[in-house]
Amino acid sequence: MIFLLHHLVEHYADQTPDADAVFCLQDSLNYASLNKKSNQLAHCLNKNAVKKGDRVGIYMDKSLEMAIAVYAIFKAGAAYVPLDPSAPASRIAEIIQDCRIDVLISADNKIKRLTKVNEQLSKPLTLMGCSQSIENCSSISWAKIHAEFSTCNLRVKIIESDLAYIIYTSGSTGKPKGIMHTHSSGLVYAKWAANEVKLTAIDRIGNHSPLHFDISTFDWFATAFVGASTIVIPDEYTKMPASYAKLIEISQMTVLFTVPYALIQLSIRGELADRDLRQLRRIMYGGEPFPIKHLITLIEQLPQVTFDNIYGPAEINGCTRFTITDVQQSTTNIPIGKISQIAEALVVDENNNQVAYGESGELLVRTPTMMQGYWGRPELNQNVFYFQQDGVNELRQKFYRTGDIVKLDQDQTLWFLGRKDRQIKVRGYRVELDEIESTLVSFPDIEEAAVFSIKLEDHSNQVHGAYTIKGDIDCNTKQLNQYLKERLPSYAIPSVLKVRESFPRTTSDKINRTALSKEAEHDNN
């Protein structure tokens, strides 16, 4: 019986052992090999004191080894915590310490960066997957793992409600927040997603998103739910649209779930007309609205493809789908679709009263794919959940406050209108403007700072920062830029950064960010 995420691999290792599970360029693993190799790593984890409920970090590029690491951690009874290989060392160290990670699965090409991370940690790590070592840290190579540990399935007592993975996102206070998902929430999502887009064992699903991005859970778990194949798209390919398109062709990819920004780059620079992409049958996008003009162009370039708009924050996974059948130049907005049959939605005003059809309000969602909560953030958990009394069974139903403003049609179709707070998407990544602002104002020479965003012609978000200097100090902009690079992901660093003599103010003497946005939009035109 399948009730845990790693049961998917164990099931197909037994039923279709020779079926391909993962491809990465010329290399591949079938389900039998993936299961055996993940068992070996799981036994190694257990021998090195990893027990049920522990958190194990994954710090590597997309690869076959990453797939092995994910399922090995599940089998050991632990939860995986994916770490962004491109993030500053300080951010990685902060997550490791926040999550109390003792074991990190990585690769030799990350040793140099890990050395910087290790300098900021209070205690040494155990590194797995590395033949090289760093100061005070023990290392266990893949060669040793595959030579010395059993390929048999483990029998660790795990239940559906046990923690499976934690994905960290931006936090409004400047501190990243960890979204906790269980085996149950991950598996229910995998089943829902696979059924929604009609995945079968012959599908070949592209893995564009890095492991620390929530869309990746579709690429791995919905794929494994039906015994299909995951096609890993290396990071260097995602940055070169023409090579990306060629990989889609060569790998015979059938399904792809990614963000609009990546699809726009494929459309504009991917030379799609030169590729035979007849096997590509379905593209799903999520994370942010898709600019209509680019969507129309892509649909014209790929007429055989079914396009779906998938909605769902990382906290609840996917919960709506809208299949795009008719889009015109005059179209101004694409619906996010109807709430899934396994979920329930409320659209409420500021007093938590449901609004009428067609009126805007915040979207609240109750679903079995919802997170447990944020790791170690009880005060935040109190604010993001809403409990509605069930008059029939006298039970309190738990809803997640998405912070998204939507409207609901009479036919139960939801339309996304914007964000309630100051959270935006940049190239598909979720960015908290307040986190950037907190980081900017923490620079020693800065007195005040304001961070805001403007919409560009292609409807993407561009982050702007403005600041004032303390006294007569001459702020070193090179030092400031380096300061931000060491503390923020690349996509969160403001594209435009300006020093000001003063800020416009509201009547309550707060910085008037609306005025700043209008100034920036005027300067941009």
Residue map of PLM features:
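AMP-dependent adenylate-forming
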Residues: 1-4, 104-122, 126-156, 186, ...
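AMP-binding/adenylate-forming domain of the ANL superfamily
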Residues: 1-128, 135-166, 181, 188, ...
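ATP-dependent adenylate-forming carboxylate-activation enzymes
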Residues: 2, 60-64, 78-97, 108-113, ...
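Conserved AMP-binding
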Residues: 60-63, 84, 163, 199, ...
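Conserved G/P- and acidic residue-centered "switch" motifs that form tight phosphate/ATP-binding loops
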Residues: 77, 172, 227, 287, ...
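Conserved adenylation A10 loop of the ANL superfamily
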Residues: 166-179
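Conserved AMP-binding/adenylation subdomain of ANL enzymes
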Residues: 177-204, 214-254, 269
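Gly/Ser/Thr-rich phosphate-binding loop
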Residues: 225-228, 253-257, 267-335, 344
